[in-house]
Amino acid sequence: MVVQFSFPRELRLLTPHSFGFVFEKPQRASTEQITVLARINDLKHPRIGFAISKKNVKHAHHRNRIKRLTRESFRLHQHFLLPMDFIILAKKGVDKLDNQVLNAVLERLWRRYSH
């Protein structure tokens, strides 16, 4: 069987209801730069959403870079993750991390929610 590493629409949290579901009773995992809120879903696959505020990451290009790298990391780890809904919250200082360090931080966080 060939494993797909695509990132289709059904792997994203899109509606306010989906976000509210996670914010209601989240399981938290944190580092100094990122907090992951997670909650088991009824689907057979994980989904991801972002809440990266302008207050914590001033410039749009930094927010976009963080989301792009996080999406890519999620895409590569999706088959090892439990069927949960994830919301990524960025803290102050995350924009100072280079790509390798950010990937290492995300790797550590994904391990907490893998099979």
Swiss-Prot record:
InterPro entries xref list: Ribosomal_Su5_D2-typ_SF, Ribsml_uS5_D2-typ_fold_subgr, RNase_P, RNase_P_CS
Role: RNaseP catalyzes the removal of the 5'-leader sequence from pre-tRNA to produce the mature 5'-terminus. It can also cleave other RNA substrates such as 4.5S RNA. The protein component plays an auxiliary but essential role in vivo by binding to the 5'-leader sequence and broadening the substrate specificity of the ribozyme.
Catalytic activity: Endonucleolytic cleavage of RNA, removing 5'-extranucleotides from tRNA precursor
Entry EC no(s): 3.1.26.5
Quaternary state and interactors: Consists of a catalytic RNA component (M1 or rnpB) and a protein subunit.
Annotated NCBIfam families: rnpA (TIGR00188)
Family: Belongs to the RnpA family.
Protein name in the entry: Ribonuclease P protein component
Molecular-function GO terms, alphabetical: 3'-tRNA processing endoribonuclease activity; ribonuclease P activity; tRNA binding
GO BP, sorted A to Z: tRNA 5'-leader removal
GO CC term (a single one): ribonuclease P complex
Keywords: Endonuclease, Hydrolase, Nuclease, RNA-binding, tRNA processing
Matching PANTHER family: RIBONUCLEASE P PROTEIN COMPONENT
HAMAP family per the UniProt record, alphabetical: RNase_P (MF_00227)
